[in-house]
Amino acid sequence: MALSSRARAFSVEALVGRPSKRKLQDPIQAEQPELREKKGGEEEEERRSSAAGKSEPLEKQPKTEPSTSASSGCGSDSGYGNSSESLEEKDIQMELQGSELWKRFHDIGTEMIITKAGRRMFPSVRVKVKGLDPGKQYHVAIDVVPVDSKRYRYVYHSSQWMVAGNTDHLCIIPRFYVHPDSPCSGETWMRQIISFDRMKLTNNEMDDKGHIILQSMHKYKPRVHVIEQGSSVDLSQIQSLPTEGVKTFSFKETEFTTVTAYQNQQITKLKIERNPFAKGFRDTGRNRGVLDGLLETYPWRPSFTLDFKTFGADTQSGSSGSSPVTSSGGAPSPLNSLLSPLCFSPMFHLPTSSLGMPCPEAYLPNVNLPLCYKICPTNFWQQQPLVLPAPERLASSNSSQSLAPLMMEVPMLSSLGVTNSKSGSSEDSSDQYLQAPNSTNQMLYGLQSPGNIFLPNSITPEALSCSFHPSYDFYRYNFSMPSRLISGSNHLKVNDDSQVSFGEGKCNHVHWYPAINHYL
């Protein structure tokens, strides 16, 4: 029965084949197992012979255990011949420098900035290699490869990196960075620390400066390659890593996530703290104490203000030499703490009960009284006296330019001991403006009316019998007199129980200068 062409196509004969064709294929199929057995036996003999030949040198070599800090990978056995085999068989070790800092970053989650122009890594990859042949030449290179094919995002509320999706790294051509010292002898490589601090990361896919091209928000890890120099390979001319004769090392703690701006604030603080090139971002107030200490060593001081709330004050009657830093009851005055030798505050005021100036009425005519005081740095606790000119000399004076200044010695502003002199003739008193202290190492500071620091022909260092300290300079300070001093209603109590009031016309405020210059 004849079959149609369509039925013949689906027949058993068409699917299985004719018997004549099957008979011709049978002897070929019968010969194939015999050939397979022969080839398998020859391969087994070759393997046994090669294993027997390599067994002796392998027994003599020490067993190499994988390093805990680095993982090594080797290229294929072909290409470099004996040189590649020797490189692979050698126990080459590589140690990461600064591993503690890398681990600290890794615990938080290392982030690396990438920019169009290229950004250097911090921390940078720095390694130390051992086990190289001192006489051979080696290249050392580094590349950065993705850890996985995931894209990440930073979750701020949990401070963690989360997977945001998959990505494709095939669009980026992998690059590697050859160390500038390559090629170099194994002895030189083992003697120095190999640093890749000049390598830069970029996200510019069109970069032509040799930077490592990466994608943002991805995880990468750097790998360090040790390549033995061969005559057929010139790493300075090629742009990709050779696949033969290479030993590769990588470190778990050097993994990082690429970002265009730091996401974790802890990473930002740690990089600012540890990166010497980030000092511009540090808090300038940390060095403020050191700068203040340097400024304190200079001889100048900032301007200060004297606040005379009330000019009158009470002192112990009949005791002209009593210190005003102690009150009548014997308790220490607030001035004692304000004017201690160790306290040089730029702002202070004199309380009411601590500024006592016992003097007779005749010593305060209607004249201008410029005020000077003297600090004696060597006699800290010695109370210096105050001696005023004779009343006749003060009464005959009409202007402040012909008056001797009212001198008051203050030992380091620790006390204000003031006395008056009732004995002696007017001629002696007119020439004696100030009792000379026992100290010879002194300095004069003045509160003077506008003009010269000392009145001409009124007082000289020889008349004072004191020498000026060579390390001090004169500086000028201005402050205004308070209104309470001008129109105050308080009185000055003197030793003979008499009172002098500004309102009685003894010291008319018209003759007082509204401002007094403080020369320091």
Curated annotation (Swiss-Prot):
Q: What is this protein called?
A: T-box transcription factor TBX22
Q: Where is the composition biased (Basic and acidic residues)?
A: 33-49
Q: Which residues bind DNA?
A: 96-283
**Where does it localize?**
Nucleus
- Organism, by scientific name, is Homo sapiens (Human)
Any single GO CC term annotated in Swiss-Prot or TrEMBL for this entry: chromatin
Lineage top rank: taxon: Eukaryota
What tissue specificity does the UniProt entry give?
Seems to be expressed at a low level.
Q: Where is this region: Disordered?
A: 1-91
Known role: Probable transcriptional regulator involved in developmental processes. This is major determinant crucial to palatogenesis.
Keyword annotations of the record: Deafness, Disease variant, DNA-binding, Dwarfism, Nucleus, Transcription, Transcription regulation
